[in-house]
């Protein structure tokens, strides 16, 4: 596996651990719809949380969250709409959707994790 793929996988594992510590229930990881992949789908109370994980080895070229581009946001919206339709019987009618980013960067020998809630709006 390429080094950047290993870093991305590690970042997703760290993000999932972080979310679980914050009492999120992980519903899916790497959920794919057509050409879109959602890194983590989680639930906290009546909120379906769509999490994009961005991991960087350094901040030399910008913060991890700066690399979530409009095209990716559009793909996430399509994917989460499909996911809700697919799992609609599993959710309460008043389920809310929130899009978060978990930004991770290497900080020496450890990793810094920043959880950005409501990172962008879907409607």
Curated annotation (Swiss-Prot):
Source superkingdom: Bacteria
Gene3D superfamilies per record: 3.40.1350.10
Pfam families: UPF0102
PANTHER family given in the database record: UPF0102 PROTEIN YRAN
HAMAP family: UPF0102
Family, per entry: Belongs to the UPF0102 family.
Protein name: UPF0102 protein Fjoh_1217
């Amino acid at each position: 596996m390429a080094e950047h793929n290993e870093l991305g996988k590690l970042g997703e594992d760290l993000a999932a651990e972080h979310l679980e510590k914050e009492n999120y229930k992980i519903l899916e990881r790497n959920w794919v719809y057509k050409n879109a992949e959602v890194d983590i789908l989680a639930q906290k109370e009546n909120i379906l949380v769509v999490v994009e994980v961005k991991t960087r080895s350094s901040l030399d070229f910008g913060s991890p969250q700066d690399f979530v581009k409009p095209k990716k946001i559009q793909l996430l919206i399509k994917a989460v709409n499909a996911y809700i339709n697919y799992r609609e019987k599993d959710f309460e009618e008043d389920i809310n959707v929130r899009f978060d980013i978990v930004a991770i960067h290497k900080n020496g020998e450890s990793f810094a994790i920043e959880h950005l809630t409501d990172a962008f709006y879907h409607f």
